[in-house]
Design a protein with these regions (language model features):
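Extracellular ectodomain segments of secreted/surface proteins
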Residues: 82-109, 180-190
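Short amphipathic beta-strand and strand-loop transition segments with alternating hydrophobic
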Residues: 36-42, 93-99, 134-136
Length: 191
């Protein structure tokens, strides 16, 4: 057979070995988080945002997962502890995951037991306007959550203001980059 003649007997095999997870929960298990309760999964063009908690613990967590044709891969996460104390004192609880080389935006999310919490306003000093996040039912019945994410958020310093449907402030906290300040709100009064 000549150098440029076609050989019809050659067969090429392409094999793909998939080491990534096929679901977001499987990706979390592969990252060492076995017993999680997914509160909300938000699929975006850039990846998947997962808001979850570990049953029996007083915390909420965020994770960002890469998602492509090979599956899901855990990239980064954040945990906020003592959420019930935070909500009792400030009227709301939150967790934040900073933007990075792997995560295209800063993410704020929270959980609440206050049925009167309708919306959370996220403000940062660079903005002249607040970003609103409506409170909605999570994947777990009876659990209310909220989420806001933007590539414009820096996460360096911020305020979170919880509003009732009537626009009354029922939650308020701020972070100046080094210290969290809780503005005490009597949430019993708002009910």
């Amino acid at each position: 057979m000549g150098l440029f003649e076609k050989n019809n007997h050659d067969v090429i095999f392409i094999m793909q070995y998939n080491t990534k997870a096929t679901t977001s929960e499987e990706a979390m298990t592969m990252a060492g988080l076995n017993n999680i309760e997914v509160l909300y999964e938000k699929v975006t063009e850039e990846g998947t945002i997962l808001l979850y908690r570990i049953p029996g613990e007083d915390q909420i967590s965020l994770a960002f997962l890469n998602r492509n044709f090979t599956g899901y891969e855990y990239l980064d996460g954040a945990i906020q502890y003592e959420t019930s104390t935070m909500e009792d004192q400030s009227g709301l609880a939150y967790v934040m995951l900073d933007q990075s080389d792997q995560i295209p935006y800063t993410i704020y999310a929270g959980i609440t037991t206050n049925e009167n919490l309708f919306e959370v306003l996220v403000t940062e000093p660079e903005f002249n306007i607040a970003h609103g996040a409506k409170v909605f039912e999570s994947n777990v019945e009876g659990t209310q959550i909220w989420m806001a994410y933007s590539p414009d958020f820096t996460g360096d310093s911020f305020s979170l203001i919880g509003l009732s449907e009537e626009g009354e402030i029922i939650g308020d906290l701020e972070h100046d980059g080094t210290q969290l300040t809780i503005h005490n709100i009597d949430t019993k009064e708002a009910e």
